[in-house]
Swiss-Prot record:
Organism (species): Homo sapiens (Human)
InterPro entries membership: GUCD1
Phylogenetic classification of the source organism: Eukaryota, Metazoa, Chordata, Craniata, Vertebrata
A Pfam family per the record: Guanylate_cyc_2
Gene Ontology biological process terms, A to Z: liver regeneration; response to cAMP
Annotated protein name in UniProt: Protein GUCD1
Length: 240
């Protein structure tokens, strides 16, 4: 007969379970998920000042079209150590025909490509590379966090109620992109994982309840590697 301790399974080793105290900040509009994620990260680092944040948005001329490279420049503005990993250094011309990108593609292509071109001179760290789940877990195990671009139509939270978990932009009555075959870009903040259950913990700025979301590693991988994301991930370091 197995003892209660044996039935519970082997004890977790250091690094097997990480759950960082990253505060949840809800987005206000359908377009500002990346900015809400940046606020979460800065607050976690103890560097969020709302007035300074608004001044930074004006200085960097951030509008309603926010790309991951914009968030990297924002982190640099606040002196936050970061590393932006992506599969595409610039804008993928193939996105021009995707409904999510189509509306602002022509005007944004030049702006975004210029940001990539100037990144090194501006000391914004950008790398073209592939990131594994193990890389992400090792980063989180050190107390660091990451902002990840995902396809919200694929991402599935195991903790959220059914009417909400497939909706990316529900706050304040704004347009809701429910689960559809089309790509819907959305930023989330990674805050931990559980190796034993094979799950990833994250904050979704689209809603504050339940506060922390959780999904399987396989679902997370599907969402972050969907065509349209460029596998963008912005690593942010605690020792900033």
């Amino acid at each position: 007969m197995r003892t209660e301790a044996e039935a519970a399974g082997p004890p977790l080793e250091p690094g097997d379970f990480v759950q960082l105290p990253v505060p949840v900040i809800q987005q206000l509009y359908h377009w500002d998920c990346g900015l809400a994620c940046s606020r979460m990260v800065l607050r976690y680092l103890g560097q969020l000042d709302d007035s300074e944040f608004e001044r930074a948005l004006q200085k960097l001329q951030l509008t309603r079209s926010i790309w991951t490279i914009d968030l990297a420049y924002l982190m640099h503005h606040f002196g936050v150590r970061h590393r932006f990993c992506t599969q595409t250094l610039g804008v993928d011309k193939g996105y021009k025909n995707q409904s999510f990108y189509r509306k602002h593609f022509d005007t944004e292509e030049t702006r975004v490509n210029q940001l990539f071109a100037q990144a090194k001179a501006c000391k914004v760290l950008v790398e073209k590379c592939t990131v594994s789940v193990k890389d992400i877990q090792a980063h989180l195990a050190q107390g660091h966090v990451a902002i990840v671009l995902v396809n919200s139509g694929v991402l599935h939270c195991d903790l959220c109620s059914s009417p909400v978990k497939y909706c990316c932009f529900t706050p304040s009555g704004h347009h809701c992109f429910c689960r559809t075959p089309d790509y819907q870009g959305h930023f989330i903040v990674l805050r931990g994982y559980n190796r034993a259950t094979g799950c990833i913990f994250y904050n979704n700025p689209a809603y504050a309840d339940p506060g922390m979301c959780s999904t399987s590693i396989s679902n997370f991988e599907e969402a972050r590697t969907s065509y349209g994301t460029d596998e963008d991930i912005l690593f942010v370091y605690l020792d900033s």
